[in-house]
Amino acid sequence: MNELMKIFGQVSGTQSFDQIRISIASPERIRSWSYGEIKKPETINYRTFKPERDGLFCARIFGPIKDYECLCGKYKRMKYRGIICEKCGVEVTLAKVRRERMGHIELASPVAHIWFLKSLPSRIGLLCDMTLKDLERILYFENYVVVEPGLTPLKIRELLTEEQYMRAVDEYGEDAFTAKIGAEAIRDMLTVIDLETEKAQLKVDLKETTSEAKRKKLVKRMKLVEAFMESGSRPEWMILEVIPVIPPELRPLVPLDGGRFATSDLNDLYRRVINRNNRLKRLIELRAPEIIVRNEKRMLQEAVDALFDNGRRGRAITGANKRPLKSLSDMLKGKQGRFRQNLLGKRVDYSGRSVIVVGPELKLHQCGLPKKMALELFKPFVYSKLELYGMATTIKAAKRMVEKERPEVWDILEEVIREHPVMLNRAPTLHRLGIQAFEPVLIEGKAIQLHPLVCTAFNADFDGDQMAVHVPLSLEAQLEARVLMMSTNNILSPANGKPIIVPSQDIVLGIYYITMERDEVPGQVLKIRSMDELKGAIANNAILFYCPTDPNTKIDTKDLDTLLDRLASRNVTAHRRVNPSSKDALEAGLKGGHLRLFNVEKPGVPLVFADVNDAEKAIKDGKAILFKVPVFVNMAEIEEALTEKTITLHTKIRARFDTVDSEGTPVTQIVDTTPGRMMLSVILPKNKNVPFSLINRLLTKKEIQNVIDVVYRHCGQKETVIFADRVMGLGYSNAFKAGISFGKDDLVIPPEKETLVGETEEKAKEYEQQYQDGLITQGEKYNKVVDAWSKCTDDVADAMMKQISSLVPGKQINSIYMMAHSGARGSAAQMKQLAGMRGLMAKPSGEIIETPIISNFKEGLTVLEYFNSTHGARKGLADTALKTANSGYLTRRLVDVAQDAIICEEDCGTTNGLTVSPVIEGGEVIASLAERILGRSAARDIVNPLTGEVIVKAAQMIQETEVELIDAAGIETVVIRSVLTCDSEEGVCGSCYGRDLARGTRVNVGEAVGVIAAQSIGEPGTQLTMRTFHIGGAAQRGAEQSSIEATFDGTVQVINRNVVVNSSGASIVMSRNCEVALLDINNRERARHRVPYGAKLLVDEAQKVTKGTKLAEWDPYTLPIITERAGVAHYVDLTEGLSMREVVDEATGIASKVVVDWKQQPRGADLRPRVTLRDEKGEELLLANGLEARYFMSVDAILSVENNTKVNAGDVLARIPRESSKTRDITGGLPRVAELFEARKPKDHAIISDCDGRVEFGKDYKSKRRILVVPEEGDAIEYLIPKGKHISVQEGDYVRRGDPLMDGNPVPHDILKVLGVEALAQYLINEIQEVYRLQGVKINDKHIEVIVRQMLQKVEITDPGDTTLLVGEQVDRVEFDIENSKAIREQGRPASGTPVLQGITKASLQTHSFISAASFQETTRVLTEAAVSGKVDSLQGLKENVIVGRLIPAGTGAVMNRLRAIAAKRDKDMQVEGESEVPAIPPVAEGSAPEAPPAE
């Protein structure tokens, strides 16, 4: 039995604890930790440097200074181990016990623990049922408190001032009642509390109380009382009688040179406590006057407060250098505190850092490591090898050899490094690809070489970036580095599943260059071997001569000598003309594509003929010439022709492409291509799913990424890596050969620019004039001008792109265009500024300056324009600095909230899921169904609606093949499994998560999907904020949408149609929720557009439209208020100077009537400004729904009709101007993402309707308007909306549940309450994706779902049923389920609750684990709360395990944990067996520690 134990080793020991409990220490507990009382404030003797006895560094209490040596030197060496010296009282032992032995200070008077007093809500206050102010009055000796009123009329816990106390003593006598002062009073009050009776009383009070505020307070007290009962702590322990003193080595005193000392602030703080405590003892012994004693007690309380949390109360105590002393709390708090500095982030040994340079000759899995660095990093390995081979006898000798850098050392180093991966890391590490493993290759020099393809993942460039190298030491670490972190294993990005090992910059340019196809002059350039041959060919008319500068000019061939000269000097190119021998030969040649017909006038233009006869006739008439298409059998021939220069890389040729079919047998295809693409085809892996058509096109960066993706999916990882490396080689060499560079003439300024700018200037003048004439307001003018210039800038840019991208035969393609189009460098936006016009600039506030910058950088800016442009550019730079921090903080909060979302089982078996459909905006499909469901599991069977066959079974993963089938079947919506609806207790299950995006396979159990999600969302945030300044602040905003066009041919369907025809005969939409849908031939809805109120509807139901037809149009800058009937308009409550004023525009002198905020004045309080329609007799008209025709005005509305004037149906009564949209960059975007994840209320949020029903306006309430929504049955629900806000519904409108009643963003909590979890998820996903989409960043939906799941962990109890839960209490979902199943087991009624949405910060602070929460934010508060309730941390998340120094329960750690659990069980079973067999032997094996209790 024992032998077995020895082999396996026991699993338990000091290290193996399963949980950590935190609770309040009782005075007895503190004394039991202590090794002695500290009585003196002295630290060390300044002459002997020995610690003073009974002082803060006392050797008798804390242990010896030197190993195995007592203080006086009587006992030295190991043999006296454990002896206590009788002279100095020091135990002979290791000096490191000074790191673990504690002392204590016995206080002369009890003091309150500041954490329990001041940490809100004050725990002491809650238990005593007193306010914090009152408590402080008692503690700091201002008031007495009645502890025991006796028979006097005084109340318990009543406060008495000194005079009142004296009066009461006089009146009732000293023994009639007890009143005390200071911490003792509070200790007595806490001691008498009986938790059981208190709880019973609270239950009674809860039942009786009616007020909500009281209930909340009672619930809080109830929770606190229950916490104390559960944890077994006593309330009076919150008042300290003994103070523990931490070990001296943890608050060291270090002698500096020059006889001064550096000391930890804690020593100062402890010294103050001891001094005051001793003085207080002496005063009490001397029976000093009460007032002096009290003052000393107060000072003691303050000293202890400062020790625990300096600065929490009153002014912080400062040291000699005027800065506050660092108290115990400060040691834990913040970035520099214990948690974040030393427990979550540690510095590691065996690491180095250096500048990186590019290493294009490396393989993907290699990195170049400077020899010097490698030798230093791998020293121990080198030493052991030197010893092993007998080159060095001792480690010291080996050390000398290494220091001298003897030649054999380098050979050993090579051997040590072989197959030993190292990890490279570039800060900031924003996602897991910021650390990857490589095999080192030794290089000369001092810089690390990095493979170019991994730069994207590291976000590295070679302008001076530095990287750190780490060496994994143990075999397991090396294994993990190789299997999980090797760069070759990280081809796909975890954020979106697309390859991240993609070529960029030069490589892209090279590949783009060789895949270009150019119609130079058609045909085959000649190489003539002899003069005679040339003469013969000319005579036979088999040759055509062209001038190369202008390939359209034919050269006359009469004068042979000049011709030869010109051929030699390359002024002429000759092309072979083919004369087919017969009609059949011609037909065969044309069919096989070996011949091509060309126009004689323009030899660059191929001709198409209906049949062979036409072709023959054209050739006879000399209208057409045949040219030969070069045909090549293999790559060798192509290479030869390229060296011979008979063809270029871009000539059209036919060639043979070798590949394999599905069985794997080699096949050849004949393809029309170019030599450059053939070069690419050689390195393409042979696979039936990787066709030649994949690369037989112009390859831009996106296309190359796509090629790599396809190769990865079909050929596997190894092939992909080899292919990527080869692509890199090919790209680099060809970029070098192409020699693409640009000069200033490559920036082509389009000739149309002047006319476009001129036209727009005219327009702007015209708007100015309209404004002068009072037809439009200042705001509308601004919007129109800005729009006009936006459009002009885009038009100039388009003209420039057209000019630059046009191909002129015989001329080189524009280099800048090639760079931008290929995605190698630069963008259309940058080119626009270089050669188009810079356009509109934004002010720092985000508004757009309406005078644009007309010049571009090539022309140069005028002084004024330059000044305008500095505005935006400077903002960009300032933003970058500020936003990086914000983004990093967002990532930190996300990681914290999601860290314990780990895949914990294969399948939870739920049938719930989310309904997914394509995202359509403005009629365009932004995210197709295919990309949204790829790699997810189906929640139910997906059936083809036409055939009824099952495409995907429930719980099966949807792969690429299934996606194609679903697309083909025309399915519009699919229900997929989602983490949001996963039923796993801990973490999430594999089925609900679906595909692991970084591997392309189903996710493994133990994958930390939460952290991956957080990184995927946070990483682009930082990227984007760092990129604002590249465009230099140029405003980017599209013109506001002002019309809807059909995106394809189809039939119109108008939903919720409610229109009136106005005086000019146009149909005006009067409905708030009118939509236009387009149906295709099979009556499937292909697009749906919302038509705003007041728009002109240009089509009708069932009308057939073609693509590009306008369906509706409107003015995007104003919200109109429109009449439904003809009549006479009357102003009601529109009083000049009160609710309306004439605004005379200074610029135009034209007056317009504007509704102003009438609530500002007292007499305006009850007004409801409106325009009412009456008939000729003055009777109020009624609308179709039976309500009076009156239209309420909101603040800032501009009236368009005069009082008592006739109006027609569909006329505009008033316009409400909309603010112009600010430019949207991620600066606006990042805070928006944070706002959504924090679940904050948006600034001007919309109120949404809770039910379906009709809208009615109720009586106004103070400054709010009352809107009633009346459902079919049940009571009306009323909403109060501030009067100035524009209400987007009219009286009598029918609204659906969840419809907004006013403008603005809805509040996520409302969506959850009204529409449920799924709608909330859809809303959050769409809103967050919207921000990233604007920046062109792709993030998979599932990452956002993981975070939203973490935000929805809590449930608010609405009905406790027969459980112990309380109404209004927020409990964890899991806890809720456990309680309910318990209730059901006992035949009780289960509780019911509603899901609660929490912001990510709040959610992370409320995790199960107090260690994780404390290390995140508000450390003291979290720890106080945890201690009071005696929380147990079961160490389930990642963070808490990192902090206590164990393997994290994810990835390989999850497997280890499982094995450890099995082993522990085995140990237990074996012990039980052993006990039953041999009862005499004690169960603990030799040499192993007994089971440790849970660590405190």
Swiss-Prot record:
Origin: domain of life: Bacteria
Region of interest: Disordered: 1467-1496
Binding site for Zn(2+) 1: 70, 72, 85, 88
A Pfam family of this chain: RNA_pol_Rpb1_3
GO biological process, one term: DNA-templated transcription
Catalytic reactions of this protein: RNA(n) + a ribonucleoside 5'-triphosphate = RNA(n+1) + diphosphate
Cofactors: Mg(2+); Zn(2+)
GO annotations of cellular component type: DNA-directed RNA polymerase complex
Annotated Zn(2+) 2 binding sites: 908, 982, 989, 992
Alphabetic keyword roster: DNA-directed RNA polymerase, Magnesium, Metal-binding, Nucleotidyltransferase, Transcription, Transferase, Zinc
Entry's family note: Belongs to the RNA polymerase beta' chain family.
Assembly with partners or alone: The RNAP catalytic core consists of 2 alpha, 1 beta, 1 beta' and 1 omega subunit. When a sigma factor is associated with the core the holoenzyme is formed, which can initiate transcription.
Record's protein name: DNA-directed RNA polymerase subunit beta'
Classification of source organism: Bacteria, Pseudomonadati, Pseudomonadota, Alphaproteobacteria, Rhodospirillales
